[in-house]
């Protein structure tokens, strides 16, 4: 009788309990048809669908290769952490997160990547975050983790700014490659085009609005925190001949109650602060860029744009001597194709698009492009759908059955495109277009 009473009380408690969650932050679910496997080693655990077992083993090889050097500059190595692989998402990315702790890889290679293999880049970048997390999970933060679990460890992430974490990780992937992201001309092109970063229009230091370079802006174009962090971190390493974030992490994890631990640690150990590092970094970059040989500037805008216009026009396709078709994106409406008169700047909307994945191409009055399409059921199934539009009709249509397409290239009577398979094979496809 007593056992029955306890059972009834337990069931009642379950009935009134709030909804339980297994984790706080998730990237979403994978398709249910995938069968999962695991590879266990003393340091990492690979969790992957059977369809990408080769990718998982290759990634494990990269992890083992970088392990001796991935913690360079920090006093503690990477934490023991599982790697979870998602093969059916074309929006390539990586993530390191607590609650629960794991590294997640979207294994489809980046569309705008470079010569460094995608899995190697992910390992060199995301595994460096595992080093940062382990160095932040010390002292008081570690004590909190015994009481609060991984919620306590998450507090340590407040002791190191996000731009510093990402900049240090970009330094890691750059150092572990022959031509990494930090060495790409496009990676610093935004700052170089601006000229006087952190100064007003008269060339004076802009003391009022320096925060926008760290927080972003809806009015002005500001490069992201990856680019900012890499420039500051690489300058700090060159100036002080050590990784300054090791001491920042060490101090912050032991004194989280001080709140502004980054500022205090930089002043205590290096006699500087974030504002000074920012100014010194871009002063040094400006001197370097000014010392380079001058080259002729042959580019000219198609049409004069209004001042303060925060709009992007991409991939112009000529329609006539005075008209081009461009993809327009801004903060007001979804991306769309517009006809642009190069003489007057007048625009005529043609059709709206989704999130475009690869550049459009045109032949015979028909425009082809690809755009990301997310599954309505599974967040981790994101395809690259082949689409087209006849200029006479101005209606976007879907090329049925082509969901893994990239870089469509039309020709007389035919269409070719690159097709990526989640199993990690890339093919070149061709199709007759007379029926469409």
Residue ranges and their predicted role:
Residues 330-334, 377-383, 421-425:
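Short, solvent-exposed loop/turn segments at conserved positions within beta-propeller repeat blades
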Residues 426-433:
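Conserved small/polar residues in nucleotide/adenosyl-binding loops
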Residues 31, 117-122, 130, 135-234, ...:
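Acidic/His/Gly-enriched intrinsically disordered linker/tail segments
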Residues 22-155, 161:
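Juxtacatalytic substrate-recognition/specificity segment
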Residues 26-29, 35-38, 220-223, 248-250, ...:
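Beta/coil-rich, acidic/histidine-enriched accessory regions frequently appended to metallopeptidases
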Residues 4-13:
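Sec-dependent N-terminal signal peptides
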Residues 95, 113, 120-121, 160-162, ...:
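Conserved beta-propeller blade repeats
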């Amino acid at each position: 009788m007593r056992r029955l009473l306890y059972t009834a009380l337990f069931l009642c408690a379950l009935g009134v309990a709030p909804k339980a969650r297994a984790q706080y932050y998730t990237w979403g679910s994978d398709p249910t048809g995938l069968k999962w496997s695991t590879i266990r080693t003393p340091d990492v655990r690979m969790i992957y669908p059977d369809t990408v077992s080769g990718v998982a083993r290759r990634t494990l090889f990269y992890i083992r290769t970088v392990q001796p050097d991935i913690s360079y500059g920090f006093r503690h190595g990477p934490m023991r952490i599982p790697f979870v692989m998602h093969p059916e998402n074309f929006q390539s990315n990586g993530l390191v997160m607590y609650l629960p702790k794991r590294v997640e890889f979207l294994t489809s290679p980046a569309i705008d990547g470079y010569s460094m293999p995608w899995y190697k880049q992910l390992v060199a970048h995301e595994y460096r975050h595992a080093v940062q997390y382990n160095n932040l999970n010390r002292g008081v933060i570690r004590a909190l983790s015994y009481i609060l679990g991984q919620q306590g460890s998450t507090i340590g992430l407040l002791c190191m700014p996000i731009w510093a974490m990402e900049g240090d990780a970009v330094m890691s992937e750059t150092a572990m490659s022959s031509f990494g992201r930090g060495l790409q001309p496009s990676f610093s092109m935004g700052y170089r085009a601006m000229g006087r970063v952190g100064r007003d229009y008269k060339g004076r230091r802009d003391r009022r609005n320096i925060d926008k370079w760290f927080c972003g802006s809806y009015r002005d174009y500001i490069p992201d925190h990856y680019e900012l962090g890499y420039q500051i971190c690489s300058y700090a390493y060159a100036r002080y001949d050590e990784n300054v974030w090791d001491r920042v992490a060490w101090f912050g994890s032991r004194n989280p109650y001080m709140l502004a631990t980054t500022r205090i640690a930089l002043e205590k150990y290096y006699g500087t602060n974030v504002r000074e590092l920012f100014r010194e970094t871009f002063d040094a970059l400006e001197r370097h860029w000014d010392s380079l040989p001058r080259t002729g500037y042959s580019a000219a805008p198609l049409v004069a744009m209004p001042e303060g216009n925060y709009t992007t026009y991409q991939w112009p396709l000529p329609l006539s001597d005075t008209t081009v078709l461009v993809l327009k994106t801004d903060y007001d409406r979804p991306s769309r194709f517009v006809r642009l008169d190069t003489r007057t700047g007048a625009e005529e909307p043609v059709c709206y698009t989704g999130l475009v994945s690869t550049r459009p191409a045109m032949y015979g009055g028909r425009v082809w492009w690809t755009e990301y399409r997310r599954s309505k059921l599974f967040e981790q199934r994101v395809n690259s759908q082949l689409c087209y539009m006849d200029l006479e009709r101005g209606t976007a249509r879907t090329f049925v059955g082509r969901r893994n397409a990239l870089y469509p290239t039309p020709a007389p009577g035919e269409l070719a495109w690159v097709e990526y398979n989640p199993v990690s094979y890339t093919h070149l496809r061709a199709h007759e277009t007379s029926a469409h």
